Amino acid sequence: MSATQNYGTGRRKTATARVFLRPGTGKISINNRSLEQFFGRETARMVVRQPLELTETVEKFDIYVTVIGGGVSGQAGAIRHGITRALIEYDETFRSSLRHAGYVTRDAREVERKKVGLRKARKRPQYSKR
């Protein structure tokens, strides 16, 4: 891998994002679409930008992302995790501020499986005493 780009893998729920940071002007490309085209919701866009705003590197990098799996929220979280890891690879001094904000830790919460005899993961059929 060349020294002109930094790489980070991010995961959240069932989504996986591969993130490449290259020196640039702040353009974010996700699956060959712009951030605005890819995410309709402003909250998802905000989540993606959080690590860049925290480290004040919004206009410093062009970001290229490939994301697969999951839904809107999971993909946004995976991209944030990937950007965080790539920023740490670029400059290790970012780690403490990113860790304090909670972006370095992989959110391990996954969907709980549905159990036999139950309607959902934990929802039980109505109990009848008589």
UniProtKB/Swiss-Prot annotation:
Q: Which domain of life is it from?
A: Bacteria
Q: Which gene encodes it?
A: rpsI
Keywords of this entry: Ribonucleoprotein, Ribosomal protein
Under what name is this protein listed? Small ribosomal subunit protein uS9
**Under the GO molecular function aspect, what terms does this record hold?**
RNA binding; structural constituent of ribosome
Taxonomic lineage is: Bacteria, Pseudomonadati, Pseudomonadota, Gammaproteobacteria, Pseudomonadales
Span of the signal peptide:
none
Keyword Ribosomal protein on entry: yes
- Spell out the InterPro entries in the cross-references: Ribosomal_Su5_D2-typ_SF, Ribosomal_uS9, Ribosomal_uS9_bac/plastid, Ribosomal_uS9_CS, Ribsml_uS5_D2-typ_fold_subgr
Q: Which PANTHER family match?
A: RIBOSOMAL PROTEIN S9, SMALL RIBOSOMAL SUBUNIT PROTEIN US9M
Q: Which GO terms describe its cellular component?
A: cytosolic small ribosomal subunit
Instruction: Indicate the family of this protein.
Output: Belongs to the universal ribosomal protein uS9 family.
Q: Which Cys pairs does UniProt list as disulfide-bonded? A: none
Matching entries from NCBIfam families are given as: PRK00132.1 (NF001099)
Q: Which GO terms describe its biological process?
A: translation
